[in-house]
Design a protein with these regions (language model features):
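C-terminal motif of bacterial Sec signal peptides marking the signal peptidase cleavage site
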Residues: 18-21
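Contiguous, structured surface segment used for ligand recognition
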Residues: 23-165
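Active-site neighborhood of glycoside hydrolase catalytic domains
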Residues: 279-285, 289, 294-392
Length: 392
């Protein structure tokens, strides 16, 4: 072979060698049978799968920050699952590409269509959220490989999916047991993996107040700590270990942002007017008896609740909710309302005076004290609605 011919062929030969080096000889095919089960999976069983290698590119629409972030998520998932590093770009590419797109005419904003061929993967969502759920399907469909020396492949076919329910929630109770921010982020990642779109954050309980309220610092100075925790209900055995912890407002906002990046809305819950012993231990004047109260170490339903006849208590709850709504942009604000015994209200002069002031009468199925709670919750609903939010 003469030198001129060799010089002409050399670049092409180098490109072939380089491309071949990018593609491992062996492949392991993933599985589209994922949870939650998609609405429809149609496999092209006799078709070559799509092989993911180091030259694979994830393509997202230019100038779309949410899609860029989603593309980065997918690249991370592929690296974690297979050991292969792929590229992310906003430049068009027609082959060996995973192409992300939005089509608002699909009919289901959170739905998506995933089309896998040997040449490319086209993922189209009804919105950015739909695309995100689509990459989670790819995530779950990937084979688990060790070091990237064996190539991952996605089976050829089409997946069509959309959620059956608009609200898909998961609750974490940090009032009874505190969990650090790092753990909550892990749980949010698991929620995202399973297409959950609401994180219900139960922040307060008889056993602990877990969110910083700047106007009422004792809520966390006192209310976030308890002496011990019951570990055997029958014998009333306690572990003897102090339990404490709370989230600063900045940490709560960090969780809100982390969840939002994964298309999850954080719904805060401040349990009112029952399950508030931790608040009463912090501010005894908010209770019917004036205390003293102690952050509880056992679990159940307890008689001491916020005094609904005390105007100071109502102002306290509104102040708390105002700060909560400043932290959490969620449309929904959860205020509990459950398991509020009325024994203290029945004997409380302030509660009875408020009942008389409101002209509340006993009804066949509703005591005066039950109706007092209705009044109390209605006042809080007005406060929430005034901020353009909805009460749960």
């Amino acid at each position: 072979m003469n030198k001129k011919l060799l010089s002409r062929l050399a670049p092409g030969l180098f490109a072939v060698v380089l491309f071949t080096a990018c593609r491992p000889a062996a492949t392991v095919k993933g599985n589209l049978d994922v949870i939650p089960q998609p609405q429809e999976i149609v496999l092209a069983r006799d078709t070559t799968p799509f092989i993911i290698d180091r030259s694979t590119t994830i393509v997202y629409p230019a100038t779309n920050e949410k899609m860029h972030r989603t593309a980065d998520f997918l690249a991370t998932f592929i690296k974690e699952m297979t050991g292969t590093e792929v590229r992310v770009s906003d430049k068009e590419k027609s082959s060996n590409a995973i192409i992300l797109a939005v089509d608002s005419t699909m009919g289901h904003p959170e739905g998506y269509k995933l089309q896998i061929t040997p040449e490319k993967v086209l993922l189209t969502g009804g919105s950015e959220a739909g695309v995100f759920y689509g990459i989670q399907t790819i995530h779950k469909a990937l084979p688990i490989l060790k070091d990237g020396k064996v190539a991952a492949a996605l089976p050829a076919g089409t997946v069509t999916d959309f959620p059956r329910f608009r609200y898909r929630g998961f609750m974490i109770d940090v009032g009874r047991h505190f969990f650090p921010v790092s753990y909550l982020k892990q749980m949010i990642d698991l929620m995202a993996l399973h297409n959950i779109n609401y994180f219900h954050w139960h922040l307060t309980e008889d056993q602990g107040w877990r969110i910083e309220i700047k106007k009422y610092p004792k809520l966390t100075e006192i209310g976030s700590k308890r002496d011990s925790t019951i570990i055997d209900w029958e014998t009333k055995k306690f572990d003897g270990k102090p339990h404490s912890g709370f989230y600063t407002q900045d940490e709560a906002r960090e969780i809100v942002r982390y969840a939002a990046d994964r298309f999850i809305t954080v719904v805060p819950e401040i349990d009112l007017p029952g399950h508030t012993t931790a608040a009463l231990a912090s501010y005894p004047e908010l209770g019917c008896t004036g205390g003293p109260y102690k952050v509880l170490c056992s679990f159940g339903v307890f008689p001491d609740v916020l005094c609904a006849g005390n105007d100071q208590t109502l102002q306290f709850t509104k102040d708390v909710l105002d700060e909560i709504m400043d932290i959490f942009p969620s449309e929904y604000i959860h205020i509990g309302g459950d398991e509020c015994p009325k024994s203290r209200w029945e004997k409380c002069p302030k509660c009875q005076a408020k009942i008389k002031e409101l002209g509340i009468k006993t009804l066949p199925k509703h005591s005066k004290e039950n109706q007092l709670q209705t009044y109390f919750m209605s006042e809080l609903e007005k406060e929430i609605n005034a901020h353009g939010r909805r009460m749960l």
